[in-house]
Amino acid sequence: GGGNEGDKEHHYEHSMPSDVEIRVSERMKGFCMELWGSLPDDYAISIRSPGGEVSPVLDFRNGIDKTIYYIFDRTRITLAVVLVEKDAGDPLIFMRFDNPTPGIWTVAVSSSERQMRGNGLYHMWLPIEQFLEQSVTFLSPSPEVTLTEPSNASQVITISGYDSHTDSWYSASGRGYTRNGGIKPDLVAPGVRVPA
């Protein structure tokens, strides 16, 4: 199956430069987030906390991991960078938020170069709902490209759900395409109020 992340507000897609707003609920101990870019672009980010603390612009061209400490918000963000991820062949920035202050966090995504070399497109994902203890969502999410692994693999037949009673898409069902433009899901099947 394609998963149930279509309506969970856990995917964001845009071109840089842009600001990504993330709503973090009360009592969240921590969460992870991934930014997947596309070559040949280089990515830089700055993160603003709900209390207004702003990190310096972090440039990842050198491939060095970084940690940000927010003194007033008492939050730590660890950033690990993979310049070229071995399976996908694209840059990946992995962010781990520990003890995040509730409210709206803003991630400013820009190019580390004066002139972008590619199209500047990037995707960000939060964990699937079952991996989060509290709510974390993008304020301007994209319901597209929300298929869960391994349904993105080209050798896998991916099935998503629709509501056969209304002939409409099941809103929670993961949607394609894949991040690199592959056509998924392969099939849709009734997925709402199906008798046992």
Model-derived segments and spans:
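Loop-rich non-cytosolic ectodomains and luminal regions
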Residues: 1-196
